[in-house]
């Protein structure tokens, strides 16, 4: 498992922008390794508290418009003009001022490679415990994650919580690198089937959070997502690249196997829990994370 402080890595890239030049959120995302990270780049820049040493003002939109800045647009304009950059009608000429030749190790590409390797290790034959289950969810306030594991055995619920800072923002396709540290801590001593509020096999690289968790922790796992992020529906099954990777029980309950369970068994498992509705144990986990985030107590 790779662990990356993506905030610090992004901020280090800004130091490469020459004086009198700017870059775009998309250029930074490409330097990280995936253009899908452009929105996350904007978020991470908005969280920068060291505005004197980390020049976030040098990042603009792909159409040359200025975008936002934590110290306000007037201060952004002042700093850009102090660097000798011309601004006309609220835009900068990217042909003249654009820098995108970053020296980068492309960390997100490395994570993609890791996901592909982990996907190859996932097992989709049945080897799971249906009598001992847990659900895990994480809720966030800024960079702090509030996580809860709800386990159910012998008709009794048990709860564990874990609070930790994250240095990896939400980027579609990379949820494992944001949430796995919480799941690892909460579930390290659990020996049943894990139900994860995310996808498993249903993922562009067949390695959603539930698969990542299941393989790394060597546990049976099932992903249950509340929205369809990829694929198309045919007779309830979710197809991606012409392969059935998941199943939509309803518009808010999309199931895919994570590890050590088949697609059909995953569907039956979740249906038995929720009677064609979103599983109650996941609802409890979600409500508890929200309460933990709001109050820091349960």
Swiss-Prot record:
Subcellular location: Cytoplasm
Reactions accelerated catalytically: Endonucleolytic cleavage at apurinic or apyrimidinic sites to products with a 5'-phosphate
Region (Endonuclease V): 80-298
Keyword Cytoplasm attached: yes
Site (Interaction with target DNA): 170
EC nos: 2.1.1.-, 3.1.21.7
Main location as per UniProt: cytoplasm
Annotated Mg(2+) binding sites: 137, 197
GO biological process assignments: DNA repair; methylation
Region (Probable methylated-DNA--protein-cysteine methyltransferase): 1-79
Tagged with keyword Mitochondrion: no
GO molecular function terms listed in the Swiss-Prot or TrEMBL record: deoxyribonuclease V activity; metal ion binding; methyltransferase activity; RNA endonuclease activity, producing 5'-phosphomonoesters; single-stranded RNA binding
Family to which this protein belongs: In the N-terminal section; belongs to the MGMT family.
UniProt protein name: Bifunctional methyltransferase/endonuclease
Organism name: Picrophilus torridus (strain ATCC 700027 / DSM 9790 / JCM 10055 / NBRC 100828 / KAW 2/3)
